[in-house]
């Protein structure tokens, strides 16, 4: 699911989103980005 990382991966205020990236890559996406403190996979 495209948004399966939203709840699992925290996004901090100032650009550190390694957990989001890792979650998205494991899920087979190219990258993860944070929007409004939520992880989105792309």
From Swiss-Prot:
Pfam families xrefs: Toxin_17
Misc note: Negative results: has no effect on voltage-gated potassium channels Kv1.1/KCNA1, Kv1.2/KCNA2, Kv1.3/KCNA3, Kv10.1/KCNH1/EAG1 and Shaker IR (with inactivation domain removed) and on intermediate conductance calcium-activated potassium channel KCa3.1/KCNN4.
Highest taxon of the lineage: Eukaryota
SUPFAM superfamilies: Scorpion toxin-like (SSF57095)
Record's function text: Blocks human voltage-gated potassium channel Kv11.1/KCNH2/ERG1 (IC(50)=16.9 nM).
Record bears the keyword Disulfide bond: yes
Chief site of localization: secreted
Gene3D superfamilies named among the record's database cross-references: Knottin, scorpion toxin-like
Keyword tags: Disulfide bond, Ion channel impairing toxin, Knottin, Neurotoxin, Potassium channel impairing toxin, Secreted, Toxin, Voltage-gated potassium channel impairing toxin
Protein name per its UniProtKB record: Potassium channel gamma toxin gamma-KTx 1.9
Tissue distribution: Expressed by the venom gland.
Molecular function terms, GO-annotated: potassium channel inhibitor activity; toxin activity
Localization per Swiss-Prot or TrEMBL: Secreted
Any GO CC annotation of this UniProt entry: extracellular region
């Amino acid at each position: 699911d495209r948004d399966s990382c939203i709840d699992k991966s925290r996004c901090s205020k100032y650009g550190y989103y390694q957990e989001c990236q890792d979650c998205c890559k494991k899920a087979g996406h190219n990258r993860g980005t944070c929007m409004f403190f939520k992880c989105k996979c792309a």
